[in-house]
Structure formats: structure tokens, C-alpha cells
């Protein structure tokens, strides 16, 4: 079954009604038919950027707890590739959450991502394949 990677941007927008992408994020979640996949790095980034509103953080945690997103583990053995990606895209610069998502795309053979981050137009999966971006 097809899965869609999801970055922190749409997750933040989903739980922050004042975010300019809020309506787009809500519409995407309502109409999306595919499982969403992310990493703990993106979850952490989302919670950090929602720190202005404890209720939004709690709602987000409940949403994740209910299984709205599938969390993929990044282990010690994966850090070699994360380092390579971070070095390759150091001029952007690539943050840890983004490197985890690019790595996950490689690991799970996925290329569709829900993001508002323009850097994903530059990142390549295994150095070649472009991401299909939703919500940019």
C-alpha cells in the first residue's frame, strides 16, 4: 500500500489555527486516503514549535497516540547515512528531522511527502529521485 511521508510543517499547521497553512493541512488530512509516516525527529520538532500552546501539544500527542501517523524508528546503525545526507546538503542546511525523512524515503522506497519545506524540492532520494511534494 502506498504511504506518504509527513514533515513537521503540516503537522504544526494542523494544530495551529493561526498558521497560514492551517486550512490546507486540515483539508489534506480530511481527504488523504493513505497512511502517513514520520519519525520521532519530526514529532519532536512539531512539539517544540507548538510550545506556545500546551493544549495544541496535548491535542497533537493524542492524535499521534490514536495512530494518525506511523512512527518509523531511526536506530544507531542509521546514523552513518544521516551524517552523509547532512554533509551532502550542508549548504541548505539540512536539519536532523529532514535528514531522517530523506533516509526514511530511501529505506521504505517512498517518494511522496506532505511538506511546506521548499528544501524537499532540492533533496534527492538515493541521490537521484525527486520527491513528489504535497502541500508545498
Feature names for model-found ranges:
Residues 1-19:
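Metal-dependent nucleic-acid phosphoesterase active-site entry motif
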Residues 2-4, 23-93, 103, 107-111, ...:
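PIN-domain endoribonuclease scaffold, especially VapC-family toxins
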Residues 7-8, 39, 116:
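A secondary-structure boundary/capping signal
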Residues 14-15, 114, 124:
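Activation segment
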Residues 117-121:
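Low-complexity, intrinsically disordered Gly/Pro/Thr-rich segments
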Amino acid at each position: 500500500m502506498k504511504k506518504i511521508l509527513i514533515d513537521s510543517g503540516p503537522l504544526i499547521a494542523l494544530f495551529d489555527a493561526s498558521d497560514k497553512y492551517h486550512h490546507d493541512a486540515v483539508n489534506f488530512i480530511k481527504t488523504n486516503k493513505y497512511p502517513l509516516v514520520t519519525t520521532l525527529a519530526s514529532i519532536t520538532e512539531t512539539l517544540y514549535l507548538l510550545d506556545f500552546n500546551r493544549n495544541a501539544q496535548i491535542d497533537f500527542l493524542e492524535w499521534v497516540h490514536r495512530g494518525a501517523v506511523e512512527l518509523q524508528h531511526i536506530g544507531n546503525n542509521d546514523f552513518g547515512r544521516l551524517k552523509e545526507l547532512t554533509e551532502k546538503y550542508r549548504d541548505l542546511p539540512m536539519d536532523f528531522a529532514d535528514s531522517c525523512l530523506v533516509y526514511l524515503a530511501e529505506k521504505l522506497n517512498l517518494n511522496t511527502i506532505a511538506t511546506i519545506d521548499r528544501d524537499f524540492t532540492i533533496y534527492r532520494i538515493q541521490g537521484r529521485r525527486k520527491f513528489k511534494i504535497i502541500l508545498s
